[in-house]
Amino acid sequence: MCVRRSLVGLTFCTCYLASYLTNKYVLSVLKFTYPTLFQGWQTLIGGLLLHVSWKLGWVEINSSSRSHVLVWLPASVLFVGIIYAGSRALSRLAIPVFLTLHNVAEVIICGYQKCFQKEKTSPAKICSALLLLAAAGCLPFNDSQFNPDGYFWAIIHLLCVGAYKILQKSQKPSALSDIDQQYLNYIFSVVLLAFASHPTGDLFSVLDFPFLYFYRFHGSCCASGFLGFFLMFSTVKLKNLLAPGQCAAWIFFAKIITAGLSILLFDAILTSATTGCLLLGALGEALLVFSERKSS
């Protein structure tokens, strides 16, 4: 059982690393900045692969009633916000900066649980939230590659992530499994992003993309679609197989590896002040993992 958990954890880390690096390559190196098309493609591939997996009996998708689908609809809207804003932010920000800002979603969740659900919060978790908030708050003033649009979309992204997780937890126990939820997310995302591609201008602007007929672009886009699906699937397996504390530890490990390797592979200018902010954010997340492991 221990070996199986380790294999699932390592698979998750590999998918996490490969997915982020591939997306960053497409968005920042090839500069394919048409999020309705890029995310629409990824969710289409994810939805098709999940549907095929269901038909082959590899996963179980329950036939949900209309009421269950309607209840989940707000979460699907937030999911579209997560991937759309995340794509725009990642195209403009270095991966370590993006991940540090992304972690502020945990502060939103912690604040909601403390203020509205009156849950008892451990001192370690409070310190973690403060460190994550301080790291993200100091970053814009110390980032030598500061991009206002990147930070704006990162804020939209983290707000959507926080709201999505709160909504997801508030519906527990839910008639929808994690796979059911993701299947609905994929379907809704494909439809909404397809309709949004015209008013946003992406549908016709993409015709001017210089690498549109290059194999490296086609290969990278195919890889991003498949890796996104495998990341989703390995995340579900990780959460179902491991305790919350162990799951948080693997996610933290994956983020550290991804952030470290991205600095070597992509152009990232890290001053001592920027590095300090990133390390502060890492310390905050390490404390969060500690509090999760202690409570589970």
Swiss-Prot record:
Keywords: Golgi apparatus, Membrane, Sugar transport, Transmembrane, Transmembrane helix, Transport. The chain crosses the membrane at residues 7-29, 32-52, 67-87, 93-113, 121-141, 146-166, 187-207, 211-231, 250-270, 271-291. It is a multi-pass membrane protein. Induction: Up-regulated by inducers of the unfolded protein response (UPR), including tunicamycin and thapsigargin. GO terms for cellular component: Golgi apparatus; membrane. It comes from the Eukaryota. Belongs to the nucleotide-sugar transporter family. SLC35A subfamily. Golgi-localized UDP-N-acetylglucosamine (UDP-GlcNAc) transporter that transports UDP-N-acetylglucosamine into Golgi lumen. Contributes to lysosomal targeting of NPC2, a key protein required for lysosomal cholesterol exiting, and that utilizes the mannose-6-phosphate (M6P) modification pathway for its lysosomal targeting. PANTHER family: SOLUTE CARRIER FAMILY 35. This is UDP-N-acetylglucosamine transporter TMEM241. It comes from Homo sapiens (Human). The lineage of its organism: Eukaryota, Metazoa, Chordata, Craniata, Vertebrata. The gene is TMEM241.
